[in-house]
Each structure stands twice: as structure tokens, then as C-alpha cells.
């Protein structure tokens, strides 16, 4: 079934910034998709097109991207007559029309909005739930419910506190099902709120962009201590582990790292990659930390390779790999990490996101599907993670509707699958063994 109409508009994301929403019509009806946006972005990501008009939304409008869809992409896709089930053909047509390596002509936010809507329409055309359609596009016969990585303490560029490292996450690997994992996560989250309130006062329980708490602490080990205390207090020491997203590119200064980067610059306090690596080793020794994302700058390849060789935990590439096959291939070659963070808007189309995922999995890596800090009510990534069988997803704390929208959709999918539902649990790094 071919596309009858495409219409894009500017809407607002969870931070109050404009983003792109696309309505796509076929004979089966209307299919709507909205595009997320990151705060700490890797320099190698596909280009997110913003208007730059400071008189409007402080320069962050997306009317140019919207116009590219309505005046250029829509007519081309409609006149092509290509069916919405042909995801790769339609995505490739948009890539050809754009003609740039990083989607800078139309903007990755324009191309992705249409690509997501096409995928939803394709599922309806095949009379399949979206997650089954995605599984078919990826050539997967399995469907696996992921372990959620709840971001319960926010720092870095996601919060107004002094904390350098961006996310401290809890992973309920010992849960019996996804629904059970949600309960465990929510209980630890509420316990953590009480722990923080008792230690730092009520105003310390304000939340960051992704729903995690943002107490004004400086020491990263203090955040880990708070999370560990909440896990123990809730009674889930045996069922819960910790993950981190350091987002180290945000505090990389002149070849070194500034763990107090939100204060005025003072080069005398900067530390080397080796010193930072030793700090992570301490974290792994003293806390149940099983996953660290972006431990070093996106171009500090030597530090990545050295650290990954010396630890037995999951090392996740985000700014390093930006969901880009070329960057992933280099990271595989240099043994820089062992897990890909999959963000659809870093690469800018469903087809390329699936290709990036398959490339990582073929090389023995784990894959974690991820939201962005600027999110919408769109739940596409919930279906994506099940269809791609990656076994792990991070989409914020169990707080804020744009985060819960994804988690709630995953609970619905698990319910729909019934006895067929399998939860990744302890095998979140390698769910194919399930």
C-alpha cells in the first residue's frame, strides 16, 4: 500500500523545545511519529536541523526541517508509489534525495520522522503489531522483553547540580518479568527519594530531564552510595545491579578530564584518562556496577581500548559510536567497547538503525536501545527493543510521562505476548542465549 499523504508539523518535546512530528496517511489510516532530541550530543551524530532564528524559540525552531518534509520529501515518496512495507527502499530514497553523509540537507530529524511513520504504517499494512514488523525487517524470529535501565540520579548536562557524571541507573536483572522489573524499579526509586530527602532535605528530590533525582552532590561515589543504600533498603540487593552513563566527552578538557566542570575552569584539578580509569575500577570493586557508558571522550580511543581490555563489565559506546556503522566498525577493530547504545535519531532512519544493531550483534556486542533527554509521547523505541531482541533499554526513571509512555508500552507488549513473552533478565548482555 503506497503513501497517500504526508504532513509534518512543529511540536514541543519534554524540555519545551520544538521538534518534528509527522502524520503519514495510507488507505489503512493515519500513522503519527515524533522525533526526540539529545542534550549531550556526540559530534559525529547525524545533523539535527534547527532554524537558528534567535527571535523564535531561541533559535531552536524546526520549521526548516518541517518544510523539507512537506515540500520535498512528501511529494517524492508519494509519487514513487513504493509500498510502506518496503522500509529500506523508502529510507534509501530519502537518503538519496538528501545526498549528504550526515543528513545535513534535510536534517536527520526530518528524515527520521518520516522513517518512523513509514514503519508504523508498514506494520498496519501487514496487520502486525509494530514489534513483530520490526522483528521481520531485522530478520529476527525471536521476541525478547528487555531489562530496563532506570536513570534514578541525574547529573552532567541533564541536571543543574555539580555532579559530573550524567546518569546513575538501576537494572532489575533478577526480576521475573518486565512487569516485575517495573515494580522493583519503582520501589527502589521511591526508596531512593526517601534516602535523599533524609540526607539532603526535600528540595534535593527535584528531578532532572529524565525523571531521576538531581541532589546537589559533587562526588560521583556519593551518588553510587545513595543508589546502593536505596537498593539495600528496598530489599533487592540480590536482584538489582547498577549502570552508569558518564558522558565523559562533556568534561574532556585539553586531553584531560575535569570532574568539577560546572565550576570555573582550573587545569590543576584535571585528571588523566588512566586516573579516570582507576576511579572506575574502584566503582566496580565497591559497588555492583555492571555497565559503564561513555567512560572517556569520543576521540580518546586509546583510553577506551585499554579500559575495556582490563574490565569484565559492559562498556557501552554512545558518543563514541553514535549508532554509525563506520564508527562501530572502528570500535570493533580497536576493541574499544563491547556494547552499542542504539539511538534512532543519531543515525536518522529505521533501516540504518537496524543495520547498526545487526552489525554490533554480529560482532558479539551487546546492544542497549535508548531514548534521548528531550523526548515525546511517541513509544516507537519500546517496540523497537522487543523486535531487535537487544535485551536492554534505557528510557529514564519511572517518572515523567514521556518516559513512562515507553515503559507502559513494554508492559502492554509483554501482556499481549502472554506465554510467548521472554524477559532478558541476567542475560541482558546476550539475550540470544535465552
UniProtKB/Swiss-Prot annotation:
Mg(2+) 2 binds at residues 245, 293, 318. The modification N6-succinyllysine is found at residues 60, 89, 228. InterPro entries: Enolase, Enolase-like_C_sf, Enolase-like_N, Enolase_C, Enolase_CS, Enolase_N. The modification Phosphotyrosine is found at residues 44, 287. Its main location: cytoplasm. There is a cross-link at residue 202 (Glycyl lysine isopeptide (Lys-Gly) (interchain with G-Cter in SUMO2)). Mg(2+) 1 binds at residue 40. Keywords: Acetylation, Cell membrane, Cytoplasm, Glycolysis, Hydroxylation, Isopeptide bond, Lyase, Magnesium, Membrane, Metal-binding, Phosphoprotein, Ubl conjugation. Coiled coil: none annotated. Mg(2+) binds at residues 245, 293, 318. The modification Phosphoserine is found at residues 263, 291. It catalyses: (2R)-2-phosphoglycerate = phosphoenolpyruvate + H2O. The modification Phosphothreonine is found at residue 26. The active site is at residues 210, 343. Skeletal muscle (at protein level). The alpha/alpha homodimer is expressed in embryo and in most adult tissues. The alpha/beta heterodimer and the beta/beta homodimer are found in striated muscle, and the alpha/gamma heterodimer and the gamma/gamma homodimer in neurons. Mg(2+) is required for catalysis and for stabilizing the dimer. This is Gamma-enolase. The gene is Eno2.
